[in-house]
């Protein structure tokens, strides 16, 4: 199976621009940002409830705890949100003004929770319609590749990804020509 595409900054901006002009723009933007800026799996994103992401005062948490049932490996883990993601999510949370903290964080057009499969298909079609041939895993792969390019160690990356084996994490990381050029300049 081919690896999911990693996006250039320009491609990522084009994707967000495309999404901004379509139905459910805010929801779709937030789904993409969580994928690209936290490295969460699509199934984990689909499983999120308001209470997972938002504290009792209505503020987006910077660290969220996924229980074992929410993760692929069935091991609870903490996901860290960068400040820029928390700020974007706060706008979404405030716009939704949800009172029921048990409600899904992302809902389909029909008002139901996304399943992992439906969200995977949703990402696939968002990408396809925006002109990108890739899968729902692109955001996660992009997240790990970008952090690797910035010098973050493989053990930290594995922990952020929820991988117990660094060999798995290494398969996610793309080594672009720009990364190689920058690497040799460090000599």
Segments predicted by a language model, with ranges:
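DNA breakage-rejoining catalytic core of tyrosine-based enzymes
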Residues: 1-13, 73-82, 99-102
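N-terminal core-binding DNA-recognition domain of tyrosine site-specific recombinases/integrases
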Residues: 4, 23-26, 76, 113-117, ...
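Short, basic (Lys/Arg/His-rich) helix/loop patches that form interaction surfaces
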Residues: 17-24, 120-159
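A short, glycine-centered helix-capping/turn motif at helix boundaries
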Residues: 35-47, 150-152, 163
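Conserved tyrosine-mediated DNA breakage-rejoining catalytic core shared by Y-recombinases
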Residues: 47-76, 80, 85
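C-terminal catalytic core of Y-nucleophile DNA break-rejoin enzymes
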Residues: 70-90, 103-124
């Amino acid at each position: 199976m081919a690896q999911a595409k990693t996006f250039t900054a320009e491609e990522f901006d084009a994707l967000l621009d495309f999404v901004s002009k379509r139905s459910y723009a805010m929801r779709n933007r937030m789904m993409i940002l969580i994928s690209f800026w936290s490295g969460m799996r699509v199934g984990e994103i689909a499983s999120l409830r308001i209470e997972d992401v938002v504290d009792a005062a209505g503020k987006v948490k910077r660290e969220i705890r996924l229980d074992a049932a929410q993760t692929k490996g069935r091991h609870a883990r903490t996901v860290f949100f960068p400040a820029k993601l928390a700020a974007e999510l706060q706008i979404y949370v405030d716009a939704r003004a949800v009172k029921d903290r048990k409600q899904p964080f992302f809902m389909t057009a029909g008002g139901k929770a996304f399943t992992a499969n439906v969200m995977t298909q949703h990402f696939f079609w968002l990408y396809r319609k925006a002109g990108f041939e890739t899968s729902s895993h692109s955001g996660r792969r992009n997240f790990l590749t970008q952090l690797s390019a910035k010098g973050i160690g493989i053990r930290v990356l594995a922990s952020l990804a929820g991988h117990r084996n660094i060999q798995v994490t290494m398969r996610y990381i793309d080594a672009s020509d720009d990364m190689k050029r920058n690497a040799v300049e460090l000599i």
